[in-house]
Amino acid sequence: MAHRLVNGMSSGKEAEFSMVEKMRLKLEFQYVSKLNRMLKDVAVSKELADKFNHFLAQKHLSLPLVFDIQVFASVNFPSSNFTNLQLPTLLQKCVEIFEQFHNTTYPKRKLHWLHNSHSRGEILSNCFKKPYCFKATTLQMTVLLLFNSLDTYSIGELAELTKLGINSLLQVLESLIKAKILITGNGEKAVDLTNDSVISLVKEYDNGRLHVNIASPTK
C-alpha cells in the first residue's frame, strides 16, 4: 500500500479504505491501524500542498518549475536511508521556499528529504535530434542537468558537484549508461570506474519514444 500511495498509483481513497475494512477481519489490529494512519497521512499531505499553494499566492512567490510535494510521518511510512545530495539550483530553490513555509507552519517538525527513494520528476531535453521527455529519479536528474554546462566530466568531478557518495553515484551512472544517454570514455563498466574515469553525453542518442521512463530498471 505504501508504494501505491507514495507513487500516486492508488485507485482512490474509497477503494483503499474499503480494502482496509476487509483486512480488519483477517489481520491484527496494529497492522490495520497503521494502514489507516497511512491513508490519513495522504489526506493531510494533500491539505498541506493546498496550504503551500495558498502561501505562494499570498507571498506573491512563483516557483521555477512544477513542484509536487508529499509529506508523510516517518512512523507511518517505511523509508530508506537518507542520501546526501546537492540539488540542481532550480530544484533547490523550490525546496528552500517549501522549507520556509513548513518551518513557519510547523516549527516543531523536522523534514527529511528522501531524494533516493520515491522522488521523481520529468526533464525535457533540447540537445538531441528529438525533444525527449525523460521520467527520472531526482538523483538521475541531478546528474543529467550537469551536462547542460559540459559534455564530459570525470567521476571525481561528478562526485564533487553532486555530493553523492561514490556507491550511489555509480548506481546512477550505471542506469544512465544502460539507458544509452551517457557513455564511458573507454567503454568501462560501472564497477570498473575510478575517480579519473570520464563520462560523456551521447549526443547521438536516439529513441523511438519521445517519453522515456529511465527511472525504471533498464532491461
What residue ranges belong to the model's regions?
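Eukaryotic scaffold/interaction segments
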Residues: 1-219
